[in-house]
A protein has these predicted regions:
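Cytosolic regulatory regions of ion transport systems
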Residues: 15-18, 22, 36-206
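Cationic, amphipathic, low-complexity segments that mediate targeting or membrane/lipid association
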Residues: 2-4, 10, 14
C-alpha cells in the first residue's frame, strides 16, 4: 500500500545538479526514518538495496552508507562497482537488477527498502516488482517517462510499488507553486495537493 509520508522541503531541490538523486535521497531517508511504521526492532540496522550505479544510485549509496545503513549496490558494470567498493562502505553485486538470481545474491528477502534508479524505467519497475515478490518490504522506482508515470496509479498495487518518483515532474510542480506564491518562504502540500500551507515572512511593522 501507500506509505503515510510526503517528500519534505522540496525547494532545496532547485539547488542541486542531479535533481533526481536528491529527490530519491529525501524519499529514501524519510522512509527509513519511519521505523515505527515498519514495525522494526529497535536498534536493527536497516538493509537498503540500490539498483543502478549511475549518478543517482551512487549518490544514494554514498549518503545512506554514511548514515550507517546496510547498503547493497547492484549494477551490471563491474568497473563502476569496483569504484564504489573502493570509496564507500557498502557491498556490491554485479548483474542485472531485474534478475531474480542477482537480487537473491543481494539478500533481497531481508531488504527493508529496494530503490531502482537505473536509466531505464522498464527495468526499474520490473526490478521493484521482482524485489517485492522475493521479500523486500518496500520499493521505490524512478520513473521518468511521463506516459509511464501517468499509469502508475493504475499499476502501483500490481507492481507492489511503495512509491514512484518522477524527478522532472516534481521539480516542475515545485517551480509552478513558487511562482504562484513568490513571497512564501516555505510551502507544504496536503490532501493530495488540494490544500497548501504557506510560511510567509512578516516584518516588524506588520
Amino acid at each position: 500500500g501507500i506509505l503515510p509520508f510526503q517528500v519534505k522541503k522540496l525547494p532545496i531541490l532547485l539547488y542541486f545538479q542531479y535533481k533526481g538523486a536528491i529527490i530519491a535521497l529525501f524519499t529514501a531517508r524519510e522512509m527509513c526514518s519511519r521505523q515505527e511504521k515498519w514495525d522494526n526492532i529497535e536498534g536493527k540496522e536497516m538493509k537498503i538495496i540500490i539498483i543502478g550505479d549511475g549518478k543517482v544510485g551512487y549518490k544514494l549509496a554514498r549518503q545512506l552508507s554514511t548514515e550507517k545503513y546496510d547498503v547493497v549496490l547492484i549494477d551490471s558494470d563491474e568497473k563502476k562497482l569496483r569504484f564504489a567498493t573502493d570509496h564507500l562502505d557498502i557491498a556490491c553485486v554485479a548483474g542485472n537488477g531485474a534478475d531474480a538470481e542477482v537480487l537473491k545474491q543481494a539478500d533481497i528477502a531481508h531488504a527493508d527498502l529496494a530503490i531502482a534508479c537505473t536509466s531505464e524505467d522498464e527495468c526499474n519497475m520490473l526490478s521493484c516488482l521482482i524485489a517485492r515478490k522475493l521479500g523486500a518490504r518496500h520499493t521505490i522506482a524512478r520513473v521518468r517517462n511521463p506516459i509511464y508515470y501517468r499509469q502508475i496509479g493504475l499499476l502501483k498495487e500490481d507492481l507492489h510499488l511503495s512509491m514512484a518518483v518522477n524527478p522532472e515532474l516534481i521539480v516542475a510542480d515545485e517551480i509552478s507553486r513558487l511562482l504562484i506564491f513568490p513571497d512564501a518562504s516555505q510551502i507544504e502540500t496536503f490532501v493530495k495537493g488540494r490544500m497548501e500551507l504557506l510560511e510567509l515572512p512578516v516584518s516588524a511593522n506588520g
